[in-house]
From Swiss-Prot:
It comes from Chromobacterium violaceum (strain ATCC 12472 / DSM 30191 / JCM 1249 / CCUG 213 / NBRC 12614 / NCIMB 9131 / NCTC 9757 / MK). Keywords: Cytoplasm, Ribosome biogenesis. GO terms for cellular component: cytosol. Pfam families: DUF150_C (PF17384), RimP_N (PF02576). Required for maturation of 30S ribosomal subunits. This is Ribosome maturation factor RimP. Its main location: cytoplasm. The keyword Lipoprotein does not apply. The lineage of its organism: Bacteria, Pseudomonadati, Pseudomonadota, Betaproteobacteria, Neisseriales. It is found in: Cytoplasm. Belongs to the RimP family. GO terms for biological process: ribosomal small subunit assembly; translation.
Length: 141
């Protein structure tokens, strides 16, 4: 059973988006969810209870299930994430260097032709999706 696929197919019906999913050492699952307006503790409990029952029905073997919000430094995984958070500060690490560097911090400035546009100190850097290793929002206080 592909647990990621199970999560991706089930969460939208509950009104949530799958932000990320991790398998932890010892047979645990860590699930990060979101929805417009943010996530509450009650949301996490509801999703956890739902998946506990679903995993039992689907015979998914696991030791521990953690459900939480993605936090202020939310990972950016899908093209829609980069569009949704346009204008916000983000950190992006690339697989291969662009202009002799692999780590960038700047404002998300849109998505075009398979690349993320990042405003780094007034200069637009285009980063192809295929070259993104990790991307996260950078909290501003």
């Amino acid at each position: 059973m592909d647990v990621r696929l199970l999560l991706e197919n089930t969460l939208p019906g509950l009104g949530y988006e799958l932000v990320d999913f991790e398998m932890t050492p010892g047979g645990g699952f860590r699930v990060f969810i979101d929805k417009p307006g943010g996530i509450t503790v009650e949301d996490c409990v509801l999703v956890s209870n739902h998946f506990t029952r679903l995993f039992m029905v689907e015979n998914v073997d696991y030791e521990r299930l953690e459900v939480s919000s993605p936090g202020l430094d939310r990972p950016l995984k899908k093209e829609a994430d980069f569009v949704r958070f346009s204008g916000q500060l983000a950190k992006i690490k690339t697989r291969m260097p662009i202009e002799q560097q692999k780590k960038f911090t700047g404002r998300l400035a849109g998505v075009e032709d398979g690349s993320v546009k990042l405003d780094v100190d007034g200069r637009i850097v285009e980063i192809p999706f295929a070259n993104i290793d990790k991307a996260r929002l950078e909290p501003e206080f």
